[in-house]
Amino acid sequence: MSNHQKRLSVPNSWPVERKTATFTVKAGAGPHGESGVPLLIVLRDVLGYADNRKEARYALNEDNVLINGKAISDEERPVGMFDILAFTEREEYYRVFPGEGGRLALTAIDPDAAQSKLGKIVTKTHVSGGDVQLGLHDGETLIVEDDQTYDAGDSIVVGNEDGEVVAHFEYEEGALVTAVDGAHAGEVGEVEEIQVTPGSAQNNVIVSQDEGEGFETVEEYVVVIDENFTGDDE
């Protein structure tokens, strides 16, 4: 199977120029599904820390590139929304955040913020033993005690080292959200109204912003965040 993908066919979330070359690297198996961006693209095209695959592999073999607290050696490992990237040798830390047009962008954060990551709950399932399994937006799962306060659509912050929930943001009117897809990707505002749609169609969400502006999008495209997640300057 080819390790390359045509640039014109890559997802909109990939931060690559589509007309500069015919092919780009293909994402390997891992979290985030089709929207995951290969780590090589982040190192080469976004940060400029490597000129090619060979240089990226050399850097990764030094074990000082971490994603969500774990050292990564695979340059094709997918990187996606709200992942935490740490470059320990450089003492640089980033959170992956939606940028304009839905392209993934890196927001600089401080070392303390890099100790945990945000996850949107997309599924909630009762498992044997009376516990609950939460499925997150990136495909990861988390077992928690049976707690009725967690619902699909909520967001949680999970510690990278111990996997414990350190914060919980409910999806409700008044919540601070960001759009991660669609025409308003990267925009931030407060949920003004959740319009419940009968049947299998998605609910609509009206989001208000400063100075009377706002936007409307589908529920799937919004993620509840804390104000610290819009940008953490060191």
UniProtKB/Swiss-Prot annotation:
InterPro entries (UniProt xref): Rib_uL2_dom2 (IPR014722), Ribosomal_eS4 (IPR000876), Ribosomal_eS4_central_region (IPR013845), Ribosomal_eS4_central_sf (IPR038237), Ribosomal_eS4_KOW (IPR041982), Ribosomal_eS4_N (IPR013843), Ribosomal_eS4_N_CS (IPR018199), S4_RNA-bd_sf (IPR036986)
GO biological process: translation
Taxonomic superkingdom: Archaea
Keywords of the record: Ribonucleoprotein, Ribosomal protein, RNA-binding, rRNA-binding
GO molecular function, one term: structural constituent of ribosome
Annotated ranges, domain S4 RNA-binding: 37-99
GO CC list: cytosolic small ribosomal subunit
One Pfam family in the UniProt entry: RS4NT
Coiled-coil residue windows: none
PANTHER family the record matches: 30S/40S RIBOSOMAL PROTEIN S4, SMALL RIBOSOMAL SUBUNIT PROTEIN ES4
Family statement drawn from the similarity comment of this UniProt entry: Belongs to the eukaryotic ribosomal protein eS4 family.
Protein name per the record: Small ribosomal subunit protein eS4
Upper classification of the organism: Archaea, Methanobacteriati, Methanobacteriota, Stenosarchaea group, Halobacteria
